[in-house]
Amino acid sequence: REKLGDAFLSPYTIIRARLAFGGFDFIVEPYSVFFENTLPPVLAAFDGAVAALKAVTSTDETHAEPMILYLQQYRSALAEDRVDKLEEAWSLCDRRWMDTKAGIQIVHDIEDGYSDPLRAKQGPDFSLRFLDETFDTQNSQIQDIHSLICKYYKSRKTSLSADGLTALSNTIAGIYYIPFKTGCSLVFSYSGQSIPNRLDVKKDKGVKIYFDAVETMARVEQVKSKVLDIFADARSSVIDKFQPDAVDQLVWHVAAHEVGHAIYGIRSISQFIQ
């Protein structure tokens, strides 16, 4: 446990308040301390998953080895009880995660800002994502868009575009099916998500972009309902005429938007913002 102070802004800690001297005493605790009664079966599940992956056949070794290293580091980061070691542990977890390229993806505690209005704390999170073969054609179109954007920024030959080209060229993107999620993913679900957020990891390893067709379809229905509430004759003049399609929006609007984050994220151009 750490006194409130330098550890306050550590993203992978939780602040506990307890009564003391007629007031409150605030303590900063890593996940492993705050969730000490919850984590043991979780850590055991990680050990089981690693053991199972080590037993896979040789034909799967290309994807198994990076996943083993990732899960081992993920477990290590969850179990870390020293506040001053948390950033190093989770940064390495991001890097190990970026090395996993299989169609089955696990996503850890990686988004900041969505679960904490102060944008200080990392929301505990976990989700399982499958590259959705239902959308093979659309995923191929997303890859074509990505290739065109890479070609454009390579042609610019500016220092700003050059700084982001490693991340952009290493980007993988696609429409994923997400059968299981927990933690802050239950509070807010993404139509499109571009991660990791650490700029050094992004520059070295690239970016992963996940598109969720189910969530995008839900957003389209919400917009339709709002349009009908606001505009007269909206169904015949707008909705029936244009027939908004969620998957088309993912491919031709959200994909380009999220891929663009890989090269021109706000964190990349902060020195140019006055």
Each model region followed by its residue ranges:
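Post-HEXXH active-site segment of zinc metalloproteases
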Residues: 265-273
